[in-house]
Each structure stands twice: as structure tokens, then as C-alpha cells.
Amino acid sequence: TPSATQTAETAEAVARTLTPRKNGELVLRLQAAALRTRENAIVPPNLLFLAGGNASVRGYGYQQIGVESSDGVTEAGRYLLAGSLEYRRPVWRNGRATDWDSVVFVDAGNVANTPAGLRHLRYGVGAGAIWRSPVGPVELAAAYGVQERKLRLHMNLGFTF
């Protein structure tokens, strides 16, 4: 029986700030991952991928995006694609920047067992605030999962990307 040791995993994550800080910044994040095996290989679920949540596709629950089984259960898949486009703008008061940023974003992603299955992206859109605290950023955002038609609150402590 083929085993999980006969696998190849590829994962890439990229985050880039595209504009200067003074007037705001445009941040782009992209994640892509693939697990290639022989078709009949037995792969432990912890080697597969799920998406959704604070550091993935906001507007969806943590690891809620996956491959839907025939009985409607979300399962991990062999391919992952996720990304985010985020605009952060400093909050100004009396002509000076404060320790706060406002943020708006669009996230997209999917998990599938074939590369072609990644085409059906799930989208999340939202807005929030980031406090640049002395110990690191604290973010609170509201995100709407477009396909799920549900609003979720997300809180991050520290850098997500």
C-alpha cells in the first residue's frame, strides 16, 4: 500500500507592502500550496490543507473552507490558494498620526483536490481597525463571507502577514 512518505509538498507565502506608509499602505498576501502524491496514496489528514479564518480568508470560520464530501462534511484537500488585498490608512488627529490605522480588505481562497477545483474561490470583504500597541499590533475587523452570507468578527494579536 502506498504511504504518505511518497509525497511531495510545495508551499509558498508572499506578503508585500506596495505603497508608502505616510498616506497608507496597500498590502498584498498570497498563499499557494500543493501536496502531490500517487493517486492511491494514503495521506494523513494533517498533511492536507484547509482555509478560512483570521490569517486566511476572513469572513469564514477557522479552517472552514475545504473539500465538501458526499455527506456534506468539509474535509482537507491537496491544493490551497488564498490571498488578500488590504488597504491600511493611519488615523490622524490634530494633524498627527495616531497609534491607530483603519483597514479595508478583500480576501479570496479555496481548497481542492485538483488544481482546476481552485477556480471556485470563496470571497470575504471587510473593514476594521488596527492599534499599534507597544507590544505589537492588535486588529479587530468585521468580515462578510460572500458565499456563506454571514458576518464574522475577527481579532488578531501580532502580525498575520
Where are these regions (language model features)?
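C-terminal structured "cap/appendage" subdomains that terminate the fold
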Residues: 118-136
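Conserved short loop/turn motifs at secondary-structure junctions
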Residues: 1-2, 143-146
